[in-house]
Amino acid sequence: MVNFSSVFERIKRLDVQYNKPTKEIRGRDTILPITLTSIFIFFMWGLAYGLLDIMNYHVKVAMGIGRQKAAILAAGYYSAYIPGALLIGGPLVKKAGYRIAMTTGLGVLALGNEFMSIGASRCSLAGMVAAHFVIGLGVSTLERSANPYAVNCGPRRQAALRILMAQAWAGIGTVVAPFLANAFVFDPDTSTARPDPDPLHPGRCQMPTMKTASCSNLGTVITFYRALGACIFALMIFVAVLFFRTNWFPEVEVPISAPVDCGWKKWKHPLVSRRFARIWWGVAANFVNLGCQVTFAQFFIEHMKVNACASDRWAAYYMSLAQTAFVIGRFAAAGLVTMPRIFKPRYVLMCFMAGAVATTAAGTDITATAAIAVAIMVMFFEAPSFPMIFESATASFEEWTPTCETMMIVSISGGALQPALMGQLVESVRISHAWWLTASCFLIVFTYPAATNLIPSFRRALDKAEIGPEAVDHGGADEENGLQRSSTSKENFAVRIVEKVTFRRKKSDETGSTTP
């Protein structure tokens, strides 16, 4: 049996930072590691996420399968977040650190892409679902390690800014994905064909008709994933050299919680208490939130084809525009949280989520150019939700922070549920009215930022983490200093009164003694 502890120990000995004392990471020290991690790690899983929706649509058309079977591909990907975070990413971070976990995640992601090419070459839906599961294992391991690394690599008060900037690079990966699919996957002879108008619903087009299965159309998928897997494997080697043979990426200490033995009485576990209500609320909100984001992305192309009468190629371009708005949304939120005393992160998150609810509801009954514009606005407003929920839900839990981070990554598995429900709704009430499901779910997500602004204990914990304890305590310090000044002035006033009374008594006594 392989002794993983000894394997990790040997890997750590190759690290130039091995057995060296850790230094305090200041704000300017985080620029290089966060920038490079964003480019090499966050961008890569953003690319994988963006390709998931585009490629799944192509596989659905090529194999002639319905929405329910196509949803299984996404379910295979997102269901992997549960074992990926609990059995791979979480233990790796605790045992070996963030950098080894990120390197391992890249390796698993490369392996999953190679499996995808094998499944496509055999025209096997089950094989491609299994490959999506392996890809999900790799991406969940990356997210379990890279997100906390961005949050914890530097002063806590800048955590929201760091993770928003890093996650913006994941958004850039999703922008690049449709262009890659257009260039290497879509058939140029059919991708420019516009759907037929719907005679019963003016301004809309008919649902894309089911085409005859033709596995020969998967040839480009085979080549694409094979090449992508090779590129990711090469990137893994390059990143490993940067991680372990340079001092550019400081190893961030992972706090370890004390073991808790509560037997079968799980309700006595410390996590099951009012102190951790915020993380549980955040997990539930993010579970629903990822379902909304995945559903919107998966049905975006069909939404464009039906309500904007766009061809496959133009629908992919519109998706690129929407993903660009997604990136702009994250950069906009990052710009706002650079001024936390004015734009507190909890305010920013609440405003963006309110915009997501409003625009999704507005897009339920519009067509043509308006449908395109509103869909793009939805992507803009939903952009900062995951990184900001992740950062705020895991703040100020000290030794329980790694466990809370694992819980947040597990919540991404919500992306496996809502798309299946959306597929059934589309079959029943058409895609326009089915968006009410997503709007309602965004409203559920909105309750989390509302709670962080309305519940006093949530507000205090987040302000202490995001603005700094000295800023939160500043009011108390001023009050204490004011009380001290007040008491001092009162004492001085009393002394002056006593002195005046004593002086007058002495003067009256002297006057009385001189009177005959």
Q: Where are each of the predicted segments found?
A:
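Extracytoplasmic
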Residues: P33-M63, L142, A146-N147, A177-P178, ...
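Cytosolic juxtamembrane N-terminal segment immediately preceding the first transmembrane helix
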Residues: M1-W45, V61, H269-R274
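Central cavity-lining transmembrane alpha-helices of secondary-active solute carriers
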Residues: I72-L92, S320-A333
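C-terminal ends and interior cores of transmembrane alpha-helices
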Residues: G46, G107-R122, A354-T367, A450
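Intracellular juxtamembrane helix-capping segments at the cytosolic ends
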Residues: S140-P155, A383-E398
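Extracytoplasmic gate region of multi-pass secondary transporters
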Residues: L52-N56, A177-F186, K268-T324
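Conserved MFS/SLC helix-loop-helix module at the cytosolic interface between two early adjacent transmembrane helices
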Residues: P83-A126
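Glycine-rich segments within core transmembrane alpha-helices of 12-TM secondary carriers
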Residues: Q158-P195, P202, Q206, E405-Q418
